[in-house]
Amino acid sequence: MFKKIEAIFREEKLTVVKEALAAIGIVGMNVTEVRGHGHQGGIELAGRVGTYKVDLLPRIQLNIVLSDHNVEKTIETIQQAAQTDNIGDGIIFVYPVDQVVRIGTGERGYLALSYEGDIDMRQHVQMQAAD
């Protein structure tokens, strides 16, 4: 019913990714600054005293919980917006989510995730207009 997308990508791509997600109606997300490395394994930097290796690079971790039917479009949007065609662009994980509860209201499921103008509301309006 719901999935959590966890995307880890370059810090400088955050604004582009957020704008691309907003354009498709993804308005709720959590963003965390993280450090890590994958295949890239870090970078070597040259300083006044020589070179040194930085093995944990700064990255952004973006978390979004959304309806199953919006997962592929969201993944494609993040991938296109975050891509630089260089090693170390990042990775996207998708996890199942059993339950969603909005703390302030007690709303559960879809109602706990819905926001004015979000992707599901846009799709609902488009379906009504088509009828």
Across the structure, where does each feature detected by a protein language model lie?
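Positively charged, small/polar-rich N-terminal and surface patches that mediate targeting and assembly
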Residues: 1-131
